[in-house]
Swiss-Prot record:
Catalytic activity: ATP + H2O = ADP + phosphate + H(+)
Protein modification: Oxidation of Met-44 and Met-47 by MICALs (mical1, mical2 or mical3) to form methionine sulfoxide promotes actin filament depolymerization. Mical1 and mical2 produce the (R)-S-oxide form. The (R)-S-oxide form is reverted by msrb1 and msrb2, which promote actin repolymerization.
Family (UniProt): Belongs to the actin family.
Name of the protein described by the UniProt record: Actin, cytoplasmic 1
Keywords of the record: Acetylation, ATP-binding, Cytoplasm, Cytoskeleton, Hydrolase, Methylation, Nucleotide-binding, Nucleus, Oxidation
Enzyme class, spelled out: hydrolase
Modified residues (Tele-methylhistidine): 73
Enzyme Commission no: 3.6.4.-
Function: Actin is a highly conserved protein that polymerizes to produce filaments that form cross-linked networks in the cytoplasm of cells. Actin exists in both monomeric (G-actin) and polymeric (F-actin) forms, both forms playing key functions, such as cell motility and contraction. In addition to their role in the cytoplasmic cytoskeleton, G- and F-actin also localize in the nucleus, and regulate gene transcription and motility and repair of damaged DNA.
Provenance organism: Salmo salar
Note: In vertebrates 3 main groups of actin isoforms, alpha, beta and gamma have been identified. The alpha actins are found in muscle tissues and are a major constituent of the contractile apparatus. The beta and gamma actins coexist in most cell types as components of the cytoskeleton and as mediators of internal cell motility.
Quaternary structure annotation from Swiss-Prot or TrEMBL: Polymerization of globular actin (G-actin) leads to a structural filament (F-actin) in the form of a two-stranded helix. Each actin can bind to 4 others.
């Protein structure tokens, strides 16, 4: 397919927006889902200061901006800002006219119905797209791994969910959702760094902590043992240089932060960890298909990028499951983008072409068409 008519695939995550053309093997544009507004009064006349900045530009000017994420826990909470992000995606990042391309959007499972209706409405009414579709993120990740059966543990910045899929069908009764993801881990790391005497408070400083988390954190195979190692030696300590040149040292925070995924009580949450949630999700499925799910547990999303997470999942699920069960955790190296890659695959399938919601269908039925056409 040529770029002229290629479908656009936009995976709007709570933390990062991934966008590009169907048929490509990676997104062309990846930028933070941030809208920033100046905190101060502009004094330089004629500088062309804007009243809002999106994505990387907001990130680079973060020192003078208040940064807002319009998507929280996978749900769009601020539609005006969301429109700015989409506008930025089409016109600045991809440099295309949305009225000339079908658009595939993604959403978290168990999202409010109104959320996808509004997405549909904005695409057709604000951007005049000829056709659009809303796909479930985890299903796309499974496509990207080349499977049609498996359970996907998808964890991004705003929401984590486990979605069992059998022969291409998501099993809605067994989908579980956990509102604990990357952003909560960033906040938790901010908190435990404060205990070490490093104070991070502003929205801009939170981005620094996110970078520390992405570069230095890992998942311990045995948490208690790792805590012992950290207490008795400095072998686990790493240093990080802040933008102002100050160097900070972090030790057990490196694995205490992502440990919250397995022990949400660290964050004061009552929910089960990601290993138990995955197990519970499998147990809600028919007894005949559990074996296939255990053997095809696929990790996806940026919050599954910690070193050691796959081994730890293997260990935890093995201890929960029947002893004879074969358990396989699949952690593709490109899992940060597997939702987008799955969308790219789906939108370029010839069989998918009749699945699009067309402008005409939208004009006839209104936004509710999305529930009938998109699973």
């Amino acid at each position: 397919m040529e770029d002229e008519i290629a479908a656009l695939v936009v995976d709007n995550g709570s933390g990062m927006c991934k966008a590009g053309f169907a048929g490509d093997d990676a997104p062309r544009a990846v930028f933070p889902s941030i809208v920033g507004r100046p905190r101060h009064q502009g004094v330089m006349v004629g500088m062309g200061q804007k009243d809002s900045y999106v994505g990387d530009e907001a990130q680079s000017k973060r020192g003078i901006l208040t940064l807002k994420y319009p998507i929280e826990h996978g749900i769009v909470t601020n539609w005006d800002d969301m429109e700015k992000i989409w506008h930025h995606t089409f016109y600045n990042e991809l440099r295309v006219a949305p009225e000339e391309h079908p658009v595939l959007l993604t959403e978290a499972p168990l999202n409010p119905k109104a959320n996808r209706e509004k997405m549909t409405q904005i695409m057709f009414e604000t951007f005049n797209t000829p056709a659009m579709y809303v796909a479930i993120q985890a299903v796309l990740s499974l496509y990207a791994s080349g499977r049609t059966t498996g359970i996907v543990m998808d964890s991004g910045d705003g929401v984590t969910h486990t979605v069992p899929i059998y022969e291409g069908y998501a099993l809605p009764h067994a989908i579980l959702r956990l509102d604990l993801a990357g952003r909560d881990l960033t906040d938790y790391l901010m908190k435990i760094l404060t205990e070490r005497g490093y104070s991070f408070t502003t929205t801009a400083e939170r981005e620094i902590v996110r970078d520390i988390k992405e570069k230095l954190c890992y998942v311990a195979l045995d948490f208690e043992q790792e805590m012992g190692t950290a207490a008795s030696s400095s072998s686990l300590e790493k240093s990080y240089e802040l933008p102002d040149g100050q160097v900070i040292t972090i030790g057990n925070e490196r694995f205490r932060c992502p440990e919250a995924l397995f022990q949400p009580s660290f964050l004061g949450m009552e929910s089960c960890g990601i290993h138990e949630t995955t197990y519970n999700s499998i147990m809600k499925c028919d007894v005949d298909i559990r074996k296939d799910l255990y053997a095809n547990t696929v990790l996806s999303g940026g919050t599954t990028m910690y070193p050691g997470i796959a081994d730890r999942m293997q260990k935890e699920i093995t201890s929960l499951a029947p002893s004879t069960m074969k358990i396989k955790i699949i952690a593709p190296p490109e899992r940060k983008y597997s939702v987008w890659i799955g969308g790219s695959i789906l939108a370029s399938l010839s069989t998918f072409q009749q699945m699009w919601i067309s402008k005409q269908e939208y004009d006839e039925s209104g936004p509710s068409i999305v529930h009938r056409k998109c699973f």
